[in-house]
Regions:
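Conserved loop-alpha-helix segment in the C-terminal half of the alpha/beta-hydrolase fold
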Residues: 77-79, 235-269, 278
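Conserved HGGG/HGGXW glycine-rich cap/lid loop of the alpha/beta-hydrolase fold
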Residues: 45-95
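Gly/Ala-rich beta-loop-alpha elbow adjacent to hydrolase catalytic centers
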Residues: 126, 130-134
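Active-site loop/oxyanion-hole signature of alpha/beta-hydrolase fold enzymes
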Residues: 88-125
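Alpha/beta-hydrolase fold catalytic core
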Residues: 1-59, 83-84, 287-295
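Flexible "cap/lid" loop of the alpha/beta hydrolase fold
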Residues: 135, 139, 147-175
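Conserved alpha/beta-hydrolase catalytic His-Asp/Glu region
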Residues: 161-164, 176-232
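Catalytic active-site module of serine/aspartate enzymes centered on a nucleophile-bearing elbow/loop
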Residues: 261-295
Length: 295
């Protein structure tokens, strides 16, 4: 079940915003599970969220990637709804239905979401930008995060590379001349699948982000020294060929910075936006990780 979003844009602005339609279409196109909508008040404004699975099951918070809508990220991990109560808030400042601007720090916002739902603590999954948000939450309130799964994660630095140049140049060109071939050229280094195999709603959403603003060049996450206070058992899943957070380098940084790292899995051949096979493998590794923490 989804709510009528005709009266509100994805970012809390006017209803004419194209993200409103893109959000609904992503729910319809990408999610095979039933979801329900909720809104809660936080210090960062009103936060919209999707929930799925049995409310009596153990809660798992899913924190969205950047430059895409929440249901796109949720689709990666939706299979977990058979065992967990998935809670997926729209991050303020990202395409979605939450109001408010990007908060100065994400940790208090995550705590506000938990408080608004009456959840004392929860396991959490963060993808890309969402992993940086999760790390901030774990440092801000370590008692609220029981386990952390960080997938193609921000928070461990981004090295300069020619792959990033291959993304940046056509992205800038696309803003001036919004042609499909430029968009596909910009996204090719990020996606494991060829552009022809990517769901159209994902391409349209990122294209709209580029037309509205630049792709996020800065990612959340605490300073490395602050991670010494991160208490939750952590799983890291990387893509071997991820241009933003390369697999081997990210695993090395995670091992250095995260005192509670349980495992770092690198998916061979995967880039930043995982293929369906990569998404499935990441989800099943997260399932076994969460089961291990529950025992």
């Amino acid at each position: 079940m989804t709510e009528d979003i005709s009266a509100q844009s994805a970012s809390g602005g006017p209803a004419s915003s194209p993200f409103a339609e893109l959000y609904t279409r992503a729910v319809d196109s990408l999610l095979d599970i039933q979801v329900e909508d909720r809104r809660i008040e936080t210090a960062s404004g009103q936060t919209h969220l999707l929930t799925a699975g049995d409310p009596a099951a153990p809660p798992v918070v899913v924190l969205q990637g950047g430059n895409i809508t929440n249901p796109v990220t949720l689709s990666w991990f939706q299979a977990l709804a058979d065992e967990y109560h998935l809670i997926a808030p729209d991050t303020p400042g990202q395409p979605g239905k939450s109001t408010g601007e990007t908060p100065p720090a994400y940790g208090p916002w995550v705590c506000d979401v938990l408080d608004g739902l009456g959840v004392d603590d929860a396991a959490m999954i963060g993808a890309s930008h969402g992993a940086g948000v999760l790390l901030e939450a774990g440092v801000h309130a370590p008692e609220r995060v029981t386990a952390a799964a960080l997938v193609v994660p921000a928070g461990f630095g981004t090295p300069l590379s020619m792959e990033l140049v291959r993304i940046a140049l056509p992205s800038l060109s696309y803003r001036v001349v919004p042609r499909g071939w430029l968009l596909r050229q910009a996204l090719a280094p990020m996606f494991t699948r060829r552009a022809s195999g990517i769901d159209g709603i994902v391409l349209e959403t990122i294209g709209e982000v580029l037309r509205e603003d630049d792709l996020a060049a800065e990612f959340p996450g605490p300073e490395a020294a602050a991670l010494s206070g991160f208490a939750a058992p952590a799983l890291v899943v990387t893509g071997e060929r991820d241009p933003f957070f390369p697999g081997e380098r990210t695993c090395k940084r995670a091992a250095e910075d995260l005192p509670t790292l349980v495992d770092c899995l690198t998916l061979p051949g995967e880039r930043h936006f995982l293929s369906p096979a990569g998404q499935a493998r990441a989800t099943e590794r997260i399932r076994s990780f969460l089961a291990g923490q529950a025992n």
